[in-house]
Amino acid sequence: LIRRQRQMCIRDRCLDSWLYDDMQPFMHVEALDTYRFLREQVETGYFETLIEKYLLHNPHASVVVIEPERGLNAKREETLAEKLAAYKDSLSKEEIKQLIADTKHLKQYQEEPSPKEDLAKIPMLKREDMKREAAPLYNTMKKCGDTTVVHHEMFSNGIDYLRILFDIRDMEIKDLPYVGILKYILGYMDTERYGFSELANEINIHTGGISASCGVYPHVKKPEDMQFMFELRVKTLASELPQAMDLLREIIMTTKISDEKRLSEIIAQLRSRVEAAFDGSGHSVASMRALSYFSRAAYYQEATAGISFYELVADLDEHFNEKKDALIAQLEKMVQTIFVPERMIVSVVCEEADYQAVEAQIAFLLKNLYPSKEIVKERSLPELHLEKKNEGFMDASQVQYVARAGNYVRHGFSYHGALRILKVIMGYDYLWINVRVKGGAYGCMNSYMRNGDTYFVSYRDPNLKKTDEIYDGIPVSYTHLRAHETLSDL
């Protein structure tokens, strides 16, 4: 995955210059001379001059203030209705008839399939262009004491990639949203040795980033089973690994969660970020919420990053003074419960020559975690009651995100590679034509996961009921589907 990401990054950099000069595809890839020049300028005042000239003393500047206005959408709709009514009144009967005829012609055009000759012009891969063999896995199971380490040996250009996972599948259901909060505060509060801004500088100096997240890993053959992990990710040069791991220890063990002022700031920032994320990814929010009605994996994701999570964050933001003591106590207890050696698993991407040094740093971290308060041979998932709610949520947007979800494994079916093909066909055929082209939505998606979880969702959709009716028509549309070599043959 890392190698593929690097290749994609290089490809995109090539396009940045190649688009404008056929003879310069590698301009932004061949960057060593540029970095060498920049390093030479560190002590010369070069960067300070740039900041002074182009930022501090730049005469070209703008200040933009955006203020909310209650009822603005209603005013805009009223203005539009008046404008359209005035336009209609200005038309003659013949012009109205022509407008109706043009609209019918447009709908007919949208419903007509593209000619095969036009579709044949689209470049396509042939069967012989694709490998039948799966990409090789570079997984070697190792041990550091009693801790499992999965080593992915591959060329990494001198960079070590570590994912440090803590098994929290036994976390109580009521505590799940607080796990979501914990991942946002680690690395953003004062620690024993650093203020939060100094900590950010140290992270930037010694690493390519330290981040926290929650990982949900459904069981492929058992939809009701899964693993739930708290994950810490570190990317750093091999030579900087000791400093990086010491920073990680500092964050895990000495974060000052009891700093009420900073915690209040983070909660307020978090609320704003989640709201902004919802505005841009309503399709993900809708599909996750729909899946959470019956899928434990989706329920956990929703509780730590979805609407349920947002509701807790908003409540804490509005009533911080009343709830701060309980929040701090909850987070401090959670830190001591999660970060113990018995829960830890490590995934490492590095070259073989660097592995021993990595293992030594893993051992260092293990020695500096909290001691276990109890010995548990096998952690189990808590009891969870799932409920189909069929909800709708309103916001200030003028568009909608309409989702339907289900699980085909629970209905006796099993995963098959053909579902990958169905996803493409449906995304560019039935859903594309009906939801996007005819319905006016900006996009439409569908997904079929290995554990059976499935969803359809529209993106920036002006319709609700109409889109839901389109989902109803999916079974009929594909009952008699015949497989052909290309989509143009369908």
Regions found by a protein language model. Give the residues of each.
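Single conserved hydrophobic/aromatic residue that forms the stacking wall/gate
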Residues: I2-R6, H480-A483, L487-L490
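His/Glu-based metal-binding/catalytic segments typifying zinc-dependent metallopeptidases
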Residues: I10-Q24, H28, S90-G187, Q336, ...
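Histidine-acidic residue clusters that define the catalytic metal-binding segment
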Residues: S17-Y46, P136-M141, A290-R343
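Terminal amphipathic helices with adjacent charged low-complexity linkers/tails
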Residues: P68-N73
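M16/MPP (pitrilysin/insulinase) zinc-metallopeptidase core fold and M16-derived inactive scaffolds
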Residues: M171-D246, I425-N434, K438, S447-Y448
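C-terminal catalytic or substrate-handling cores of phosphate/nucleotide-
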Residues: A238-T254, S258-A303
